[in-house]
Amino acid sequence: EYSKMVSAVFHNRLASGMTLGSNVAWDKEKADDNNYIYDSMAGPYGYGSWDAIPAELREAYDTYTHTGLPAGPVSNPGLLSIEAALWPEENCDYLYFQTDTLGNYHFAKTNAEHEAITADLESQGIRP
């Protein structure tokens, strides 16, 4: 289980003033049963579509451009994730991680390392 290491990456990025850069929030425009952001903003408030939601609300959840935490939850975490958020892996200096389609996690300290991992996963055909 990598929950504590993933949490450490997010803690490290926040402490460094970086964006979170999380695909969890990046896929927010998809209207499906498992999209907390879309379902909680588009439906209940009557916007009807992602594009109808005011830009300032959409941008507040864009973890690739907005620094700090998103404006609100991006999912409904389980106990393991909550515990990892409270107690991330200690002495972990990673700033990036990438998953593959086999369920493995790959961690990197620099963007160059992260891009190399991503390219390798792509070449193996196991990048999500």
PLM region spans:
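Bacterial extracytoplasmic/cell-wall-associated proteins, especially those involved in peptidoglycan
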Residues: 1-128
